[in-house]
């Protein structure tokens, strides 16, 4: 299959992956309304073309949490990344490091912190949930520190798991899920060999290291479901500050009031996010939520955004709407599933090229020059 655009990797991933894995990353919550609007709302934003601006000098570099990024992009935390390619978190982290952008390891990764961190030559980020098992949380923070993690991404929009109906249809969950997954793997021999056989162990490395026994796919939903904590409040974040003195980014902000509370708390950054449409269906897309949040807290902390970003044009749109940087989730997992580390590197190169074209043709010579003036109109205008 020819890959000529960043969006081509989705079809390539679907061909290679067993359905339960493809639909797990591709799907969203309930009727997937927000999942669709994330992409549609971004695509509806028109950029303002400008010409004859002498764009011979152009820089995509940006500074974030005392790090220099080659472009305002980081790879988002995605659970079970290691099921999409052999030791997938390591491959994705290497690709990100090679392109000069951060990689964020998920709490529920296949590869543990201690396997991923030594594989790259730049510090990585780590994502953590609020869980009932505070001992696990403290253990994860201590291990992250020891591994040289620089930035903590704290996910706050999962006090309960979202209802992802597509998972039950595809075999990720629901009746007879385990035998259905086995049958699907048998009809996808390339994945079965590369990941199913050579990619073992298939446990959740960060959790297994704490529990002292493997935490396999069968335990994944049960363990998380039993440990998500609906009593989460800002006091829990204060408790985390006792164990983490580095940059802390709060992921899952969609309302300006919550953004202001993050400033009061002393967060270093927020991620404007609806969890890729995987939690509460019917909420605002990140693109629609971002401008009001930027108006409320721009300059008081770093604003990142995710959900719906598939191309370099989308990155430029999010920056113009008020983000300082973005997180790529599904986009990099599609590329990883299709072509491993090389696929993720190529995806980032395509994103960079698309950004350069957009910046040249909107007259923005640096990331700092991308603003609302780069847009023909704002959403809803």
UniProtKB/Swiss-Prot annotation:
Its EC number is 1.1.-.-. Transmembrane segments: none annotated. Its cofactor is FMN. Its main location: membrane. It is a peripheral membrane protein. It comes from the Bacteria. It is found in: Cell inner membrane. FMN binds at residues 106, 127, 155, 251, 306-330. One of its GO terms (cellular component) is plasma membrane. Keywords: Cell inner membrane, Cell membrane, Flavoprotein, FMN, Membrane, Oxidoreductase. The active site is at residue 275. Substrate binds at residues 24, 129, 164, 278. CDD domains: alpha_hydroxyacid_oxid_FMN. Pfam families: FMN_dh. It catalyses: (S)-lactate + A = pyruvate + AH2. GO terms for biological process: aerobic respiration; lactate metabolic process. Residues 1-380 form the FMN hydroxy acid dehydrogenase domain. One of its GO terms (molecular function) is L-lactate dehydrogenase activity. The keyword Repeat does not apply. The keyword Electron transport does not apply. Homotetramer. Catalyzes the conversion of L-lactate to pyruvate. Is coupled to the respiratory chain. Belongs to the FMN-dependent alpha-hydroxy acid dehydrogenase family. This is L-lactate dehydrogenase. It comes from Pseudomonas aeruginosa (strain ATCC 15692 / DSM 22644 / CIP 104116 / JCM 14847 / LMG 12228 / 1C / PRS 101 / PAO1). The lineage of its organism: Bacteria, Pseudomonadati, Pseudomonadota, Gammaproteobacteria, Pseudomonadales.
């Amino acid at each position: 299959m020819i890959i000529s655009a960043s969006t081509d990797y989705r079809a390539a991933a679907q061909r290679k992956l067993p359905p339960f894995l493809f639909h797990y990353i591709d799907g969203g919550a309930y009727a997937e309304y927000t999942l669709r609007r994330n992409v549609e709302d971004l695509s509806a934003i028109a950029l303002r073309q400008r010409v004859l601006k002498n764009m011979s000098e152009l820089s995509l570099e940006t500074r974030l949490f005392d790090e220099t990024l080659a472009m305002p992009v980081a790879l988002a935390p995605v659970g079970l990344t290691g099921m999409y390619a052999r030791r997938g978190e390591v491959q994705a982290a290497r690709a990100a490091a090679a392109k000069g952008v951060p990689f964020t390891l998920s709490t529920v990764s296949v590869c543990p912190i201690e396997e991923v961190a030594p594989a790259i030559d730049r510090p990585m980020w780590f994502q953590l949930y609020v869980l009932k098992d505070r001992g696990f949380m403290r253990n994860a923070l201590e291990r992250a520190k020891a591994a040289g993690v620089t930035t903590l991404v704290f996910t706050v929009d999962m006090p309960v798991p979202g209802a992802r109906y597509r998972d039950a249809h595809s075999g990720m969950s629901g009746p007879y899920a385990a035998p259905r997954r086995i049958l699907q793997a048998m009809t996808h021999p390339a994945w079965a060999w590369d990941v199913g056989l050579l990619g073992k162990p298939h446990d959740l490395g960060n959790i297994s290291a704490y529990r002292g026994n493997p935490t396999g796919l069968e335990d994944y939903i049960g363990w998380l479901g039993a440990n998500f904590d609906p009593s989460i409040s800002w006091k829990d974040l204060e408790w985390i500050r006792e164990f983490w003195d580095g940059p802390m980014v709060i992921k899952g902000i969609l309302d300006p009031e919550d953004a202001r509370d993050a400033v009061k708390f002393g967060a270093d950054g927020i991620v404007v996010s609806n969890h890729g449409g995987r939690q509460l269906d019917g909420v605002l897309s990140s693109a629609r939520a971002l401008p009001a949040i930027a108006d409320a807290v721009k300059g008081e902390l770093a604003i990142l955004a995710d959900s719906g970003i598939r191309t370099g044009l989308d990155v430029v749109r999010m920056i113009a709407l008020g983000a300082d940087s973005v997180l790529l989730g599904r986009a990099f997992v599609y590329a990883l599933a299709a072509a491993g580390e090389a696929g993720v590197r190529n995806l980032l190169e395509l994103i960079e090229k698309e950004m350069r074209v957009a910046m040249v043709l909107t007259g923005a010579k640096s990331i700092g020059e991308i603003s609302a003036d780069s847009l023909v109109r704002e959403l809803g205008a």
